[in-house]
Amino acid sequence: MNPSDTHDHGAEASPLGQSVVYRDSYAPELLFPIARQIKRDELGLAPDTLPFVGEDLWNAYELSWLNSRGKPVAAIGTFRVPVTSPRLIESKSLKLYLNSFNQHRFVDPTLVHDTLTRDLSTAAGAPVAVSIEVLSRRPTRVFGYPHGVLLDEIDIEIDTYRTDPAFLQSDFNADEVSETLYSHLLKSNCLVTGQPDWGTIVLRYIGPPIDRAGLLRYIVSFRSHNEFHEQCVERIFCDVLRRCAPRHLAVWARYTRRGGLDINPFRSTGHFTQFDNIAEVRQ
């Protein structure tokens, strides 16, 4: 399947939940892009007036190919897909695509980088930034926690596990604050298979103070919600922006890996421009 032929497809046509044959030869046609606008329409977002900037940062831990003499090379890849791309890349298709490199010979890692950049950019419909770290060069990885207030120790009763933005409230009579709030209790489900997705969610904002207990209830309300990682983060961003009216807002999540990949969406009004690729302990 050619990525350019699938840009209007929804998730139901993806390889998720289907039996597949793993390819041992390079196969860019395995990439399955999904139109972002299908789910953005539900949020009332127009493609030319998005309320956020940002990216989807992917870490690929099972990247390997053969060198010119047939010897395997192992590496870690990082892919940054801009939110302005018309398409996201379905995760199982990306895993299958990366596996197709396993028996393919490349003269040097530069060719792998260029091939990944070309194929992923074609699938997403926008330039994708690619970096590759060969394991023989001993790349390092930093683990850490967000610098902010952890919500998970708030002692509250919760009985709602379907998304409910009504939990989100701010004190509009109080002075403006600048703070970072986070939780390890984000859990949603794959849009297609229903498999659980686990993540840490971080909100950084400047504006009226957000009610922390309500925010925690809202995060937990995603527990039975079915959407892709990127779509959940955009929904959270839009709900917080509309109901809490922060002057500046950034939302990002670090999801646990599946199939050798983790996905880390980042959305911001623009004041907060980036987040560090610091691994969450479950990654």
Curated annotation (Swiss-Prot):
Pfam families: QueF, QueF_N. Coiled coil: none annotated. Homodimer. Catalyzes the NADPH-dependent reduction of 7-cyano-7-deazaguanine (preQ0) to 7-aminomethyl-7-deazaguanine (preQ1). GO terms for biological process: queuosine biosynthetic process; tRNA modification. This is NADPH-dependent 7-cyano-7-deazaguanine reductase. Gene3D superfamilies: 3.30.1130.10. NADPH binds at residues 91-92, 258-259. Belongs to the GTP cyclohydrolase I family. QueF type 2 subfamily. The keyword Nucleus does not apply. InterPro entries: GTP-CH-I_C/QueF (IPR043133), NADPH_dep_7-cyano-7-deazaG_red (IPR050084), QueF (IPR029500), QueF_N (IPR029139), QueF_type2 (IPR016428). PANTHER family: NADPH-DEPENDENT 7-CYANO-7-DEAZAGUANINE REDUCTASE. Keywords: Cytoplasm, NADP, Oxidoreductase, Queuosine biosynthesis. It comes from Aromatoleum aromaticum (strain DSM 19018 / LMG 30748 / EbN1). Substrate binds at residues 89-91, 229-230.
